[in-house]
Amino acid sequence: MVKYLVSKGCDISLIGDVAVQYACYGGHLEIIKYLVSQGADVRYDDDMNISISSMTGNIEIVKYLVTQGCDVRTGNNHAIRWACGNGHLEVVKYLMSQGADTSVYDNYVLCWAVTNKHFEIVKYLISQGTDIGILNNFLIKSASENGYIEMVKYFVYLGANFRDEDDCAIKMASKNGHIEVVKYLVSQGADFRAEDNFAVRWASRNGYFEVVYYLTSQGADFRADNDFALSWALINKHFKVVDYLLTLDIVF
């Protein structure tokens, strides 16, 4: 259809550059090659095409664009940032082999891979020397907050300080109801009573019965902060939590 439209007089010089972008979004390599053969500029809009193709994960288009002169580092390494954020490991590997820089914005690529649960990319970036020093504790806090138990274990193995910021990791895991992460962090020595029993208070407030039950079984003070746990469980209508806390003889 593209060739037909061109044969009928469509002016590549007017629309070709934008058309290449649409073809990159759609993953249409042959159309891209044809448009380029007709004079379209693959580097239009500050090499946006390689960022688009990295974002969508089309490795063959990414490779082709590089052969046509596209810069993998354009936009402060926008391409690899999007590839990491969207979980496209093969694109990440290729871009790094072409010199993409993973350290931009204080290793933003690693943060985004963790947040979006792309564990294989996380491991690959670290295996290639991405510096986790300034991010180490952020990474485990993010993994704990989002319930990514395998990542949490991995970062502990690497030496992450899961007790940073007054045991932020277990507080966030409890607040968001990630029982397996909570149990694991406790097994590693996290203080579930930190910040006036924040963990059990917020697990109660948000209605995570399993977490509340586990933390109280470990000795969390469910009466901390003037019975915050029961008050907020009641306000938020988490009646299973309310009933359980009442069995623990809370004075309300």
Curated annotation (Swiss-Prot):
It comes from the Viruses. Keywords: ANK repeat, Repeat. InterPro entries: Ankyrin_rpt, Ankyrin_rpt-contain_sf. Pfam families: Ank, Ank_2. ANK repeats lie at residues 1-14, 15-44, 46-74, 75-104, 106-134, 136-164, 165-194, 196-224, 225-252. PANTHER family: ANKYRIN REPEAT PROTEIN, GH09064P. This is Putative ankyrin repeat protein L62. It comes from Acanthamoeba polyphaga mimivirus (APMV).
